[in-house]
A protein has these predicted regions:
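N-terminal leader/targeting and accessory segments in enzymes
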Residues: 1-107
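Phosphate-binding loop of NTP-binding sites
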Residues: 29, 74-77, 86-163
Length: 163
């Protein structure tokens, strides 16, 4: 099980503010983990006003530095960890340089797998039909009276299932 004190006062860069990383930021705030976050997103501030307002309100206890726009991620130096969203290319030079310099690369899904109370997890990958396939699996298991949750990029971030 994860020890949240390990994250105390760490400098963490959140790469991409999709639904998974947004849920991750709010989850860290709800746990009261005093981290120093920099949120990077290629979109301009005007496109993220609602998310910024929501996070600033709900995660007011966190130290957050917003780095928005295409040029915002020129360097990812000085962080303890990078939390990459699935849409952020793992082989971009900035991430590779950070990894080379000892920065830990992580993702919300890694943390979800670590915290999930069961190991009975079904993952669906691929480029076409993930939502349909995952929904069918969910419906079949639900009809068979299994306790089942459906989450991921189909609408509900995995962290929504934790308190």
């Amino acid at each position: 099980m994860i020890n949240f004190r390990e994250y105390s006062n760490k400098k963490i860069a959140v790469l991409g503010l999709g639904s998974e990383n947004e849920a991750l930021v709010l989850w860290f705030a709800n746990k009261g983990v005093p981290v120093h976050l920099s949120i990077y997103d290629r979109r301009e501030a005007s496109a993220l006003e609602d998310k910024q307002e929501k996070i600033s309100h709900l995660a007011s206890g966190l130290s957050i530095n917003w780095q928005l726009g295409r040029k915002s991620y020129q360097s990812l130096k000085g962080y303890d960890e990078l939390w990459r969203s699935p849409g952020w290319p793992i082989f971009c030079p900035q991430i590779q340089e950070a990894i080379h310099n000892g920065v830990v690369l992580n993702s919300p899904m890694n943390l979800f797998f670590e915290l999930c109370p069961t190991r009975n997890i079904i993952g669906v990958t691929g480029s076409k039909g993930k939502g349909t396939t995952a929904s069918l699996i969910y419906d079949i298991l639900k009809l068979a009276n299994y306790p089942v949750f459906l989450g991921g990029n189909i609408g509900v971030p995995p962290f929504a299932f934790f308190d």
